[in-house]
Amino acid sequence: MVLVACSQQTAGAPAGPDTDKIVLTGDQKADWAQIIALENQAKALVDPSGCSSAFDCRTAPVGSRACGGPRYYLIYCARTTDSVALFRKLNAVAAAEREFNSKYQLVSTCEFRMPPKLGLSGASCQATTPGQ
């Protein structure tokens, strides 16, 4: 048996993943500004505070360098951040940046960037070592 369900977005319903899709215009500066705006929306979802243990601290990769891998990592508290919404937004940022890098034939360094080690300061997640 196969179950199939369809849904129709109604006014006031949460935005779906397609609402984060960026259409590159051919203007490199304007296209990068779109990616940064989407990245800023992702950053607005992050809350590094409200954790009672360092085990609740997480990192999330941001962007996509031309040679692969993220540009950097965001630090957040899993208890106070909607990680599903965050990663939906960050996946859109990475996809847009991959397309941007390809369209404009950008290159980057190819070193592997490790996420930072995390710790708790008060009730706020912080890097204890810098990410590379």
Where are these regions (language model features)?
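Sec-dependent bacterial lipoprotein signal peptides
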Residues: 1-4
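Bacterial signal peptide processing site
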Residues: 6-9
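N-terminal low-complexity, Pro/Thr/Ser-rich intrinsically disordered segments
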Residues: 14-41
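Extracytoplasmic/periplasm-facing segments of secreted or lipoprotein envelope proteins
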Residues: 31-67
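Extracellular disulfide-bonded cysteine-rich modules/repeats
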Residues: 58, 114-121
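Mature extracytoplasmic domains of secretory-pathway proteins
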Residues: 59-96
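Functional cores of ribonucleases/endoribonucleases
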Residues: 84-117
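Short, low-complexity, Pro/Ser/Thr/Gly-rich segments in the mature regions of secreted, periplasmic
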Residues: 121-132
